[in-house]
């Protein structure tokens, strides 16, 4: 019995083993691996085409040094996309609704882009804290604001992904519960509510794909500033 709407976001366990580990391993089992054959199947061809188009669009503004990140970000994109889509299926735990997981992905990758900027172009990286032509009276305030803006980036990355997916799951839960309650009393209203639930589910599919893309896009923009 569900005691709270947020019980669906608690990490279940089986025989003392957290099921979040199985949920994190599931995308790597579902995504087909390329083969050495001349002619691959349709799924592998579609996957290769999608990754190639995504990588070209994402790394076109970056210089050659930033292209080293292409395998990592493309793999992370497929990983997040698969987790988000699987989370919309019934009785499947969604790891990306956990802020700890999202921050665990956002903070190290953001920190890596900052350290790369400090190593490759320290003058340019430190110049973001104090733009040229700043009045002397505003220098301390501006440095504090730029520092806060820099350190809030990974928090915004993790919270954005968590909040969007959590809100969508809660809405689906509420509307589906309303359909079951209204079905015996007002069937017509229940059918209309079910249609609304179907439209909301389609919207959540789009949100799941968009949020995975936005997460990687923002990381690439942070990388573009420092590479």
UniProtKB/Swiss-Prot annotation:
Localization (cell): Mitochondrion inner membrane
A Pfam match: ATP-synt_A
Name of the molecule in the record: ATP synthase F(0) complex subunit a
GO annotations of cellular component type: mitochondrial inner membrane; proton-transporting ATP synthase complex
Annotated family: Belongs to the ATPase A chain family.
TM region(s), chain numbering: 14-34, 73-93, 98-118, 137-157, 179-199, 203-223
Quaternary structure and interacting proteins, as annotated: Component of the ATP synthase complex composed at least of ATP5F1A/subunit alpha, ATP5F1B/subunit beta, ATP5MC1/subunit c (homooctomer), MT-ATP6/subunit a, MT-ATP8/subunit 8, ATP5ME/subunit e, ATP5MF/subunit f, ATP5MG/subunit g, ATP5MK/subunit k, ATP5MJ/subunit j, ATP5F1C/subunit gamma, ATP5F1D/subunit delta, ATP5F1E/subunit epsilon, ATP5PF/subunit F6, ATP5PB/subunit b, ATP5PD/subunit d, ATP5PO/subunit OSCP.
Membrane topology, record value: Multi-pass membrane protein
Naturally occurring in which organism (per UniProt): Gadus morhua (Atlantic cod)
């Amino acid at each position: 019995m569900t005691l709270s709407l947020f019980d669906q976001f608690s990490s279940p366990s089986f025989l003392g083993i957290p099921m979040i580990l199985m949920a994190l391993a599931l995308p790597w089992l579902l995504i087909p691996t390329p083969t050495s054959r001349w002619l691959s199947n349709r799924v592998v061809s579609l996957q290769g085409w999608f990754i190639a188009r995504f990588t070209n669009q994402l790394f076109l503004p970056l210089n050659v040094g930033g292209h080293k990140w292409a395998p990592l970000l493309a793999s992370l994109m497929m990983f997040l996309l698969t987790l988000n889509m699987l989370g919309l299926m019934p009785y499947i735990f969604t790891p990306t609704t956990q802020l700890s997981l999202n921050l665990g992905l956002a903070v190290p990758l953001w920190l890596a882009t900052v350290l790369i900027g400090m190593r490759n172009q320290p003058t340019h990286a430190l110049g973001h804290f104090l733009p040229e032509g700043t009045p002397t009276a505003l220098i301390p305030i501006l440095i504090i604001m730029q520092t806060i803006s820099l350190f809030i980036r990974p928090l915004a990355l993790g919270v954005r992904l968590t909040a969007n997916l959590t809100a969508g799951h809660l809405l689906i839960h509420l509307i589906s519960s309303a359909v079951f309650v209204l079905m015996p009393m007002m069937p017509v209203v229940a059918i209309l509510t079910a249609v609304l639930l179907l439209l909301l589910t389609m919207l959540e599919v789009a949100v799941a794909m968009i949020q995975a893309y936005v997460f990687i896009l923002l990381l690439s923009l942070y990388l573009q500033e420092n590479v």
